[in-house]
Structure formats: C-alpha cells, structure tokens
Amino acid sequence: RRIQGLLLESLRFRWSAMNPPISLDSLEEDTESYQGSLPLDPALADRFSYIVEIPDFSEFSLEVRREVLSRGGEIPKGDSGLKGLLEETQTLLVQTSSAEYCWIEDYVNQLVLPLKKAGWPISGRRAIGLKRSIAAINASCRTLNRDEKLQDAAFLAFKWGLPQRARGTRFQDSKLKAIHKLALKAVGKPKDSPILRIQSESNSVRRI
C-alpha cells in the first residue's frame, strides 16, 4: 500500500487494466497482437491478487452484448448493491474457520512443486496471496448463494491468481485442472504418505 515509499493509509482496493502483452504464446496463436503492450515485471505482477482475462466482445452472449451496447459508457445510477455485497462478504470472510484455513494452507503448499515442475513457479508472496484469495472467493460464493464449495473456490483463485498471465503466458485449463487434482489428493495426507512423498520430491530420479 505504498507508492514510491509513501504510505497510502486509506487505500483499500487497487486494480489496473492492460492490453494482452506480446509473448511467444501470443505470437504463435492466430490472435490480434498489441505491439505496445509489454509484459509486467514479475515483482509488480505479484502485487495483484487476480490477473483476469476479459473475453473478446464477440465471445459474450447476445444478451450481454445488448446490455453493453445499451448501457456502455454511462455512469451507473442508483445503488448497484455492490457495497452491501462487499460488506456481507467481509463479514463471512472473518468467519472463515481455522479448519478451513488449515485446508487452504495445505492446498497452496501442495501447488508449489507441481507449478515449479510445469515452469510456472510462484513466490512466497503469491502463495500467501492465494491463501487469502481462496478464502475471499469462498466467502463471495456464499454471499452470492452460489453452489461452489471450498475446493471450487480454490481452483478459481489458483486459475486466476497466477502472475505469469501478466507476462503473456497462456494456460491450458486441462493442465491447471491436473495440478489442482494433484493438490487435492495430497491435502490432508500424513507426512509419511507414499503419495505425498512422491509429489513432494523435487528430484525426478528419486521420485522414480
């Protein structure tokens, strides 16, 4: 919460928008490239809890496109209800149990090595951020009366919390789901569990 070393005491939320950065992945795909968009520095990307891709306008449903055309560019009027949703979510977030946090910490811990093996390592800062994001998304789902459980919230936070997106990396859902399933299998296992010992071994020769 600092800019050039100056503390911003009233800062609560921060976000930014950027065009998709040029990368080898984007150049290989048949997609429009933004020549002036540069990948974010890893340290800067790590300071954003979520790196979310906005769909192309053509990918929206007909109804959503109509809504954008009808209301796009207008200043929102009246109470959108967002403040109330945030307050309710913050209340539910505080109620996150120690057992839930224990599960979340174990889950994030089990992501570290598979992500490194996949070439997408995360820092300690990102790991802590994922822990907070999972709890926040879980509370948000409860506020919105959605069907997603804690495991589903974990995948959403994991999928949209990888900082490499800000460097132009393209992720395949199948690979992310495979890593997610590996982490789920390892959560709660005793330290001497064969599965946990295999997954926790960084040396490929010893793992065999």
Outline where the language-model segments fall.
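Canonical AAA+ ATPase core
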Residues: 2-83, 89-90
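C-terminal engagement/docking regions of AAA+ P-loop ATPases
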Residues: 139-208
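Generic detector of well-ordered alpha-helical segments enriched in charged/polar residues
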Residues: 45, 66, 70, 83-94, ...
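Short, Lys/Arg-enriched charge-dense amphipathic segments
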Residues: 23-39, 84, 104-108, 141-151, ...
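A broadly tuned preference for mixed-charge, low-complexity surface segments
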Residues: 33, 38, 42-45, 51, ...
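Conserved NTP-handling cores and scaffolds of large molecular machines
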Residues: 21, 48, 52-56, 72-76, ...
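Conserved AAA+ ATPase small/helical "lid" subdomain
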Residues: 72-149
